[in-house]
Structures are given as C-alpha cells and as structure tokens.
C-alpha cells in the first residue's frame, strides 16, 4: 500500500511538471535605436556662391564647382542636394516645380506638412516641406528673393526608406536646414 501511494504521488508530480513546463512564447520588446549626433557648430559656406549661409561643421561639402554645394552627412549616409538658379522671368515654373516635387512622394508619404519662411529684411522667402513616411526624400525646401535668386534643396539617405529608422537623423538634418534658411543671405 505504501508503494502504491508513493507511485501515485510520483506519477501525479511527474504529470504536473510535464504539463507545467510548456512555456508560452512572450514577444520581445522592440528596442529603440539610440543615435547620437554631435551638437552642431556652424561655419560659413565658401565665398564662391551667389549666397552665404552657415552649415554644420562636420558636414562635408561635395560638388563645390557647381552653383551650389551638396552637404554630405557621413555619419548618417545622407546628402542634402542643393540647386541654385538665377531668376530670368522663370520664377513661376521654378515655384511650380518646388511645390510639385514633394507631391511626387505622396504615394509613400503619410503627410507632407509645410512651413513657410519669411525674412523680408534679408529678402529671403521660402517653404520647408517635411515628408512623413517611407518616401525617398524626407525633406525638401526652396528659398528665393522672387527677383534674382532661387535655391532648392532635397535630403536623401543612402538606404532603403524606413521612416522609423531614419527619423532621428532626418530631424537632426531638419534643424540644420532651418539654420541654413535663417542664416541665408543673397549676394548682389
């Protein structure tokens, strides 16, 4: 009888342990990407362009022989492409292009908020478009004095567009672009 009680207890304990060992898979929490970029220090663009502005000092200038430099962010693998055009009765077509270009990203974008920029004392007017979503370009802008000068810029990352991953870098570059817009001066 003692053996039967012991066997029953052993069998019951074994069954409970075997049934209790089935572990439920818990989803792992998603890690947040922590990117840290240096505090920006700004310096003046070379004196060979029809404009002046300040840019982040760890940015590399590319295509200096062009009418506007491209700003390459090596730590982010991103480039802010700049294009300058002298106005010759073509401001309507340039403004049309500047407003249509962000619209081409609407297929992948969730929204494209725009911020109007005006500095009448410096004759600088423009718009900054922030593309929210998995679009190829996360940021576009233009600046003009509406009579002689027109500057456009587009930000591209050298990676597959994944907004959640590149958002911290895009926000960092956006602050640099706002600083560029605020410090831009046309040369006459």
Indicate where each model-derived feature is located.
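Signature of long, low-cysteine stretches enriched in small and polar/charged residues
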Residues: 60, 99-154
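Bacterial N-terminal signal peptides that target proteins for export
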Residues: 2-11
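Surface-exposed amphipathic alpha-helical segments
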Residues: 59, 154-188
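C-terminal motif of bacterial Sec signal peptides marking the signal peptidase cleavage site
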Residues: 17-20
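Post-signal peptide N-terminal segment of mature Sec-exported envelope proteins
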Residues: 29-50
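Bacterial signal peptide processing site
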Residues: 22-25
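Secretory pathway targeting signatures of secreted, lumenal, and periplasmic proteins
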Residues: 48-100
